[in-house]
Amino acid sequence: MQQLASFLSGTWQSGRGRSRLIHHAISGEALWEVTSEGLDMAAARQFAIEKGAPALRAMTFIERAAMLKAVAKHLLSEKERFYALSAQTGATRADSWVDIEGGIGTLFTYASLGSRELPDDTLWPEDELIPLSKEGGFAARHLLTSKSGVAVHINAFNFPCWGMLEKLAPTWLGGMPAIIKPATATAQLTQAMVKSIVDSGLVPEGAISLICGSAGDLLDHLDSQDVVTFTGSAATGQMLRVQPNIVAKSIPFTMEADSLNCCVLGEDVTPDQPEFALFIREVVREMTTKAGQKCTAIRRIIVPQALVNAVSDALVARLQKVVVGDPAQEGVKMGALVNAEQRADVQEKVNILLAAGCEIRLGGQADLSAAGAFFPPTLLYCPQPDETPAVHATEAFGPVATLMPAQNQRHALQLACAGGGSLAGTLVTADPQIARQFIADAARTHGRIQILNEESAKESTGHGSPLPQLVHGGPGRAGGGEELGGLRAVKHYMQRTAVQGSPTMLAAISKQWVRGAKVEEDRIHPFRKYFEELQPGDSLLTPRRTMTEADIVNFACLSGDHFYAHMDKIAAAESIFGERVVHGYFVLSAAAGLFVDAGVGPVIANYGLESLRFIEPVKPGDTIQVRLTCKRKTLKKQRSAEEKPTGVVEWAVEVFNQHQTPVALYSILTLVARQHGDFVD
């Protein structure tokens, strides 16, 4: 039997000594031996730090984003290899899609976020300038820099691809290498994907390592520049979190654990409403997808007391139609658990719930002697959920959920929160007031809550689907950690530092001009410069323009804006302005007339306007002038040879009056041509 090799220190290595076996979930056949005994974990970490970390830190965010996109495209081209291996885990094609293509999709999402929202630099200014002095000579910004260590990702068995990729994406975008430690039961699928990434040559040497087997003494060798993430059981995560070296060196530890997630039926819903059918469908889908082996799966079904039997009957009727078996056979809707060990664990947890007072409405007993690790869809009923703590603390990690009655909506809220912290929850209701109250009271114990009704159902991504744009994690039992959430996740792999100094020094450090920093003026209008020629701080001070009552009248007639402060002399005199004032949007238009270079040149288009603030009113007779300054530049990747190479330039605009008082502050974005393209076929 072949051993599943690890990829450490840039080479594929086999362990020695005691090994565990990976079995086929359907046939029970032994497929792989897994061991990492004898492998040098300290050397593996050092290799990642010496090779992978410097290479990734040297890349800009834009370059890292491009790397993510390239890896995603490569993995997508090889997806059928992964689907074939995924069948060994008992998953259906639909189950595997979530894991394989869902994981690859997360790479694409982070590639897009990085290219659109992060600077073309290795430093990430997190906020705008923070003034710290009266005259403006001393200020600060928070900057994010890549940690110099390695991210250790300890992952669960249920999503061997997505579980790795959803962590790799923000890790690499943040500039850190990763050591992946997958769960043994499905490590062959993770290994295949890692091998594909390594063989592609798309990532720097040392950017990714893989441990098939135990992590050994790896955690003992980490220091404060390293990061550890864990996905798995709450018990294991709590044990690792207090590992002496992690505690002693305050090593960041992010934990995402299984939880007793709930689905609540609002008291406004009756069996003849569309929401009732949606509720049944959502629960059944979450019970049977991946054979219930999801950390976000619905475990507790909370319904009004009067609807218990109606809900139970509807769930049983639908669950009885679920065909369980080998996913390779036509018509099979639910596959097996990952192995016989997991099947025995689910049976044990079901027995605990039964001993605590729950009743079987469907299923409940697996054939523990069968070769395939099948477990039937199981619906339990807990008649007294307030007196049965086991139902809020015992998770059968399979196609098992427990129905329980709520006396009223307040009681339903209490039961929803009784899980002690959950990754996800769903409320099915058509009543906005019920939804608001549920969020107000239950959100504090949940990482994500879906409000499902007829209006949202058609496009809903579902109760159990973590999305890369949204946070994934939860308080309490769910681990107290947070993954994904768009760019929030990237910050877990970076150090935030408050940097103080003069505005000019802060601008030089961040490569972004800030208000108060020195500017550079020359005889060439900034709009006549190509993207490569522009530098943050390049500036233009425009001629002046005096505003008149005729301007106000003409703009009002042209725009249709006859607001009294502009057109009614008497009403305006009694307003906070004391007299008629110029339209704010005319001030912007006049400002554009002052700073725009009208001829054909590198500036292609106005991309948008941001952060507009009107500081002081402009009155007839006031004279305005504009300072236009290049604030930051963002390269746009050229997607084809035919596409014009461009970049986005953000300009700081300050409009001030004859007293040098700012009257309007804002930023404009322009699409600017580049002199040279970068497309590579």
UniProtKB/Swiss-Prot annotation:
Upon gene disruption, the observed phenotype is: Disruption causes the conversion of phenylacetate (PA) into 2-hydroxyphenylacetate (2-HPA).
Query: Which pathway is this protein engaged in?
Result: Aromatic compound metabolism; phenylacetate degradation
Biased composition (Gly residues) is annotated at 473-484
What keywords sit in the KW lines?
Answer: Hydrolase, Lyase, Multifunctional enzyme, NADP, Oxidoreductase
**Tagged with keyword Membrane:** no
**Pfam families attached to this UniProt entry:** Aldedh (PF00171), MaoC_dehydratas (PF01575)
InterPro entries attached to this UniProt entry: Ald_DH/histidinol_DH, Ald_DH_C, Ald_DH_N, Aldehyde_DH_dom, HotDog_dom_sf, MaoC-like_dom, PaaN-DH
| Protein's GO biological process | phenylacetate catabolic process
Q: What SUPFAM superfamilies does the record point to?
A: ALDH-like, Thioesterase/thiol ester dehydrase-isomerase
Gene3D superfamilies in alphabetical order: Aldehyde Dehydrogenase, Chain A, domain 1 (3.40.605.10), Aldehyde Dehydrogenase, Chain A, domain 2 (3.40.309.10), Hotdog Thioesterase (3.10.129.10)
Active-site annotation: 256, 295
Recorded E.C. number(s)? 3.3.2.12, 1.2.1.91
Member of which family? Answer: In the N-terminal section; belongs to the aldehyde dehydrogenase family.
NCBIfam families reported for this sequence? PaaN-DH, PRK11903.1
Relate the protein's function as given in its record: Catalyzes the hydrolytic ring cleavage of 2-oxepin-2(3H)-ylideneacetyl-CoA (oxepin-CoA) via the open-chain aldehyde intermediate to yield 3-oxo-5,6-dehydrosuberyl-CoA. The enzyme consists of a C-terminal (R)-specific enoyl-CoA hydratase domain (formerly MaoC) that cleaves the ring and produces the highly reactive 3-oxo-5,6-dehydrosuberyl-CoA semialdehyde and an N-terminal NADP-dependent aldehyde dehydrogenase domain that oxidizes the aldehyde to 3-oxo-5,6-dehydrosuberyl-CoA. Can also use crotonyl-CoA as substrate.
Q: Which protein are we looking at?
A: Bifunctional protein PaaZ
Name the species this protein comes from. Escherichia coli (strain K12)
Primary gene name = paaZ
